[in-house]
């Protein structure tokens, strides 16, 4: 009998993912890091992905790609904040001291869910550096799922300028141009 193959999420080149690189060996990268997907054509049947990890630490051999993460994340977080404030302002009360408990609880739950996401991204207002020399292929199982529906990671993508910088650095580091 034929075994069913596991189906994985499909990722696009340039998409930003959060990967848990632990456990690691020796000097390999460890811990959770954002990474740029560089796989050209991904498939739901493919259980691995080639990525370039990102760091906020500046080192001479890291590629400076600016603060594109915060430039994409902060406007999304600001819009969600506005939506939550609007929801709070729109809580209906027929009496000054009486609110619909279910509506209030729903808004409180949404605020708490949003706080989980905001706490992750709050100190991401820094430059990002691509660790091109650490290009690696990882199991898709290492990719962390979005925290909840407020998590902007599902919408983060490196633009073509950043991908061109990364491609050129890959050529510089790994391709022998004689």
Where are these regions (language model features)?
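Short, charged beta-turn/beta-strand-edge "cap" motif at the junction between a beta-strand
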Residues: 22-28, 42
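Short beta-strand-centered aromatic/proline hotspots
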Residues: 30-41
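Eukaryotic intrinsically disordered and solvent-exposed regulatory patches
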Residues: 4, 21-23, 37-38
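Basic/aromatic-rich interaction segments and small domains that mediate binding to polyanionic partners
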Residues: 39-59
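C-terminal terminal-subdomain/extension
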Residues: 1, 9, 62-178
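Active-site-adjacent loop/helix micro-motif of nuclease/hydrolase catalytic cores
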Residues: 27-30, 60-61
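Residues located in well-ordered beta-strands
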Residues: 34-36, 50, 131
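Loop/turn positions that initiate beta-strands
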Residues: 13-16
């Amino acid at each position: 009998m034929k075994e069913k193959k596991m189906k994985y999420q499909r990722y696009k080149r340039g998409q930003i993912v959060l990967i848990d690189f632990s456990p690691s060996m020796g000097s390999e990268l460890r811990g959770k890091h954002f990474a740029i997907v560089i796989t050209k054509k991904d498939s739901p049947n493919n259980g691995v992905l080639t990525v370039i990890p990102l760091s906020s630490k500046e080192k001479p051999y890291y590629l400076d790609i600016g603060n594109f993460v915060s430039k994409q994340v902060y406007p999304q977080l600001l819009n969600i904040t506005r939506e939550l404030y609007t929801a709070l302002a729109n809580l209906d009360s027929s009496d000054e001291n009486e609110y619909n408990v279910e509506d209030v609880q729903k808004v409180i739950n949404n605020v708490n869910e949003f706080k989980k996401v905001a706490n992750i991204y709050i100190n991401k207002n820094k430059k990002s550096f691509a660790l091109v020399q650490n290009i690696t292929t990882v199991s898709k199982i290492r990719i962390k799922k979005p925290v909840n529906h407020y998590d902007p990671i599902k919408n983060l993508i490196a633009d073509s300028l950043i991908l061109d910088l990364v491609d050129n650095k890959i050529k510089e580091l790994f391709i022998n141009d004689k």
